[in-house]
């Protein structure tokens, strides 16, 4: 059984007719079953929502997020990313995973991208060498934030020195675990 295949249980739930219509409609739009859609919704709750509620996360429209980023000076943004990165990541990772190491750090990055919409992430590794690529739609300043945030976290948590390549929509970082 692969890591992605998990043992399932049959659970019956009672929902309103209105909610059923909404789920049917959305499942059809996404070309999936209502069962798969509900499983996805519950997965997001289990992996993201129930934790982020405790940390005061908020959801804002992408246009507003981009506009706020544009108002911030690049140096101030970099300083802020470095200042909050380790404390925030350690606090959340400790709460979610009960420990902080390379594995939980990568899980945190993946979940933050998947549910927090930080970007689309790809993580590759060959032995001790890691390459992490984040594709996003938030512009150059988000790439700056991600670079300074991940640089500080990886140097502190993994004790590795990452190398970066950034564009307005991509951050790629490479590092070797000591």
Provide a role label for each language-model segment.
Residues 58-62, 66-72, 153-155, 160-165:
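Generic N-terminal amphipathic/basic segments
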């Amino acid at each position: 059984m692969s890591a992605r295949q998990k043992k399932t249980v049959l659970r019956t739930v009672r929902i309103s007719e209105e909610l059923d219509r909404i789920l049917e409609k959305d499942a059809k739009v996404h070309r999936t079953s209502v069962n798969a859609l509900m499983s996805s919704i519950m997965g997001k709750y289990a992996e993201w929502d129930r934790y982020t509620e405790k940390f005061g996360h908020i959801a804002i429209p992408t246009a507003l997020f981009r506009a706020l980023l544009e108002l911030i000076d690049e140096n101030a943004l970099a300083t802020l990313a470095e200042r909050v990165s380790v404390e925030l990541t350690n606090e959340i990772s400790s709460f979610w995973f009960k420990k902080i190491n390379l594995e939980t750090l990568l899980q945190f990055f993946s979940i933050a991208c998947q549910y927090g919409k930080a970007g689309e992430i790809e993580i590759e590794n060959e032995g001790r060498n890691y390459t992490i690529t984040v594709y996003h739609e938030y512009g150059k300043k988000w790439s700056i934030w991600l670079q300074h945030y991940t640089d500080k976290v990886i140097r502190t948590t993994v004790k590795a020195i990452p190398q970066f390549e950034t564009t307005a929509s991509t951050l790629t970082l490479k590092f070797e675990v000591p």
